[in-house]
Amino acid sequence: MNELNKECREQRKSWNGKPYCSLDYMLRERFGEKVYKVTLNGGMSCPNRDGTLGTRGCIFCSEGGSGDFAADVSLSVTEQIESQIALLSGKRPIQKYIAYFQAYTNTYAPVEYLRKIFKEAMSHPRIVALSVGTRPDCLGEEVLDLLEELNRIKPVWIELGLQTIHEKTAQYIRRGYRHSCFDQAVENLRKRNIEVIVHTILGLPGESREEILETMRYLNKKDIQGIKLQLLHVLKGTDLAYCLLYTSTEDGECDKEPKAFVIENGEYKEME
């Protein structure tokens, strides 16, 4: 055990003192300097919104499809990149960026359209990698072949929104696919040597500390290259915000009697 602890301490030194390899550390090691993400909008939708699986999206998802800080969708991909770089470069002298397609489901479109926008992003001289946020059930063979093709040009990362391994919670948040679909997607991506980053949410309603740890233990055994640990973020106007304010009925809907109150900023200041 002492040897193991010593090994862990030595590893922390190589990770700048942290007990894990952070994204910032990995990017510096890989690209030789600080790298930022520029968040892009490919103008896509989601099967959980267009009626294929549902119309209201995941319970926590905003109207912006979790891409509220993405660039203006009316701009071309190149223009989006330039506008994002202009915003970021005013703060720090960053030279290298990752093109991150975040809003909605970014493989939920015809393959030729995906090829066009992804290649446009990757052709920018200051873009060093492509990161694509998507769903495991939107990775068909043609899409996988395209991603494999692009991965030979510059690194391609796929960010999958798993959130939890527990089916009961997945149904509550309206994730819209079974856990086995996630497993298959990871396997398919790794066969093509495409790196996978998994998004999880800590603090989902009804989940215990042990259930959260079960999700982490499961992912520790998977062939994935990164994990994003997100604290539950309740956005105004989402179904999650509504359901946390109101008591759930037996059929899973929300009662009209509020069980909590939101304190507005002005009210909070009056309490100080």
Features from the language model and the residues they span:
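Conserved small/polar residues in nucleotide/adenosyl-binding loops
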Residues: 246-251
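Short linear proline/tyrosine/threonine-rich motifs used for host-factor recruitment
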Residues: 260-262, 268-270
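Acidic (Asp/Glu)-rich catalytic clusters
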Residues: 89, 118-125, 147-155, 187-191
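Catalytic cores of alpha/beta
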Residues: 205-220
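Distinct, well-ordered alpha-helical segments
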Residues: 111-119, 140-149, 210-212
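N-terminal [4Fe-4S]-dependent radical SAM core
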Residues: 1-57, 62-98
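Short beta-strand/loop segments at the ligand-binding rim of alpha/beta enzyme cores
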Residues: 192-200
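Core AdoMet radical
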Residues: 64-84, 88-111, 126-139, 155-181, ...
